[in-house]
């Protein structure tokens, strides 16, 4: 459910009357500023989600908190997204911007990047390995924040702050599961703190262990078989199929699927698709259910934080956070298959008199003694984060300092289930295909001739045979980031009519590394139907940051911030200065008007720079050849298809010449707190993002190649020389290859409105009632991929985006005596149905439309049984809400809902016991 927006300002507004004036409040440092100050709510909107909020609203992980935040309007790939590159990781998209546009911090210092790439191309952070029970609070800053936090802080900054103080030892144990089955989980946490008798030494430590079973698609009615509520009758997957070149299906099983009827739990039988040749094949409706919706998990984290006061002016500090995670998942039995077309192409069978292919899916009964579970893939990760340093005051001055070193490392081992190319082909050659016959086909005079034993094809295989051509391929990858950071701060630099001006100066030096080393078999072509791409590199980085906060007079405060970042890689330096100007105006005590303008950026990631070359196949208009035949650019509709849709082999890779992604960002808003325990915030945010990284256009290169060859552009120019190097032609003048590296070319324009409201009232003996509501609405979001393209309206073009425009949530908490209960509701706006997302016509396409808005509810109750003991019951998705019916999916769909927006987990129950020792 959506993480509740809790205005940090409220903690200041809710002080009792003796503390209402800012000048009487203790100065603290909050995310969004480097300078300690009394006013927690500043020109930068900040949202705080406390440990109490996390528990009361039923959130199970940091990823759960952030993905359900009202800011997170963008859908992201995850455990439900079968056959993606990072199925074992979790991330978030703020305002529908890419996941890599968020800066993640732990205790104010950057997190290490995940070693694998989101969607196979982009660097991002995995937020699944943070121990939720050891989190003190999470702070979210929407909008560009690069002038303080550097690269990546375009969509916002998320700072996870771990516990630093404890009154005594705490032990908690939690267990639960889902009413529909699967997902049973267990979590135990122990934390304790110690302070020396003289108060100079303080240590806090904690450990957390968690286990969770997977949720299988066969455990949910919606996903256990192929779609039964589509616009066509159910189309069962083709587990055993002979496919003809000319007449589609050929059914050649003399036993009419009888020999394979025991597969997939005895559900394999004769199936029919009208209009497809012979129309018959062997299939099971339950093939679709053999995949995971939610990963299994075994994880453990350990955390230690300590301080030692050397004297009144020097404090040493250090902390260590270690995480180990193992997730298992399955992309689907339907994806574990073999087909003759992959390595043989069509073959000619003289007994059939046609060109045909074989295709068959392997069943759980063939896979091993544990069935489908024996073919799961596994991700094992290990991350460590170490920080140590010193902080204090420089002599008797007003200057505070903080000098620290942080090192993070993230190791990932992806163990993927694979089929080995030569053994699996040889197995079917020996068992089914038989020896190649003399001659070639009489139709095209090019395809080989085989006379397969089709009765042998329509047979189960033994688990031993299956094991002979399957196994695992292991990819190993690692990221690391070392940083030295020096900060000097003076909160009373000089006096102004509104108060003391403050200044902070920060210097940073760091070294970043990334290495992705796929299994050798994935690189040399030994794996059937699967490949990978290697990459790796390192760079040094430098940064200098300053912030000046000036209370010009009592109602008005101006804050200036500037930062310079430089990255040195492969002898090249990429640098970027950023700045921001922020205004806070308080016409009276209960109202804050605020505004901020600045710049933000994202440096080219190490994967952008160093991802190795990989191949792909596509088609392109050969503008030069079309022009030779009288069809100039813009008039190629009648150009022969050989040239107007010319097949070529493309090559893509990283690019050392990439520049930073740039953004101009600004916001205006207000915070209003007319009475105690009431606060309203409203903020408008605006982004203008340019130079985004995308793959270079093959169409654009073909067009430029024509311009150079036609003499429109100087053939001897650097532009034409570069184009000639990227577009390869054979002796006949036909395009054979195009090199399309990553380039800076795209841009986005985004406007959003965020709001939150909080109110609480003490009813005396009837208890205390409080409510919090948050809202995010994207007003405008346009994307232009290549220069000259028409901007795409991402809010109204479902072919490009399925994200909801608006998202909101509300929580109602009642505390009375020893009881506390919370009701939490999460809502998001209408989203496109499936038909509108697969056709360039969008909502004008056949069967296109919108799905209704979607709301779910969580409830929790906590009882203080006795001093130190708390018992809690939490129910998530109280009404067991499933994704809305989308009848625009066909009957052949494995799951008939958008997994980026919805899940089919259903209702979950959790029981928790928490005991605080010494109370």
Each predicted region: which residue ranges?
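C-terminal beta-signal and adjacent terminal beta-strands/loops
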Residues: 679, 690, 779-782, 826-837, ...
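Short loop/turn motifs that connect adjacent beta-strands in outer-membrane beta-barrel proteins
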Residues: 165-168, 197-200, 311-314, 393-401, ...
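N-terminal Sec signal peptide and the immediately downstream disordered periplasmic leader
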Residues: 1-69, 189, 193-195, 312, ...
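Short acidic/polar hinge/loop motifs at secondary-structure boundaries
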Residues: 109-142
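N-terminal periplasmic accessory domains that precede
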Residues: 62-65, 90-93, 125-128, 152-173, ...
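Surface-exposed, low-complexity loop segments enriched in small/polar and acidic residues
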Residues: 119, 221-230, 259-297, 303, ...
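Extracytoplasmic beta-strand/coil segments of soluble accessory domains associated
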Residues: 63, 67-110
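C-terminal beta-barrel architecture of Gram-negative outer-membrane proteins
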Residues: 616, 767-864, 879-880
